[in-house]
Amino acid sequence: MTLITRRSFALSALATTTLSACGNGIGGSGSAVIDSRVDSTLNFMYNSYPGTRDLANNASGMLVMPVVTEAGLGLGGSFGRGALRIGSSTVDYYSATSGSAGFQIGAQQFSTVLFFMTQEALTDFRRSNGWAAGADIEYALQDRGETLRAETTTSLAPVIAVVFAQAGFRAGATIEGTKYARIIP
């Protein structure tokens, strides 16, 4: 009889611990933290790359990932959380995840902003269960003092990605193959 009581107690304790770890996140401060980081990231981007302000003004919406952490040693992956902004309002929160295999070593962090230049691209993104970044993205890069211009890049692709603020020791940053999924922070 004592064995059953101990077993029941152990199972009850395990079940209670497991259930207490399953919070739904509603009422937490996760969204406020993400919004604060998104605001800081946008201010940094606008000050460092003034041409991105034109992109933002012409975009139907922007997905801002303030910090994406990428690491690998043979197998690699990345993760970040951010917000979808339409105008100056946050409408949804998203996570970005990716995985890779091959010769790789190192870790880095970077910020990324996806500019949805057409309403159709924004609608497709919002309606998908999990949107994967692929060949339909145009990367806007700033090399040799050139400025980013919305007029020249808008016609190239419906989604424009800007990757900036890289820190770490891994060669290059890419969002290709990254899956974006809606979250409740």
Predicted regions located by residue number:
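N-terminal secretory signal peptides and thylakoid transit peptides that target proteins
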Residues: 1-21
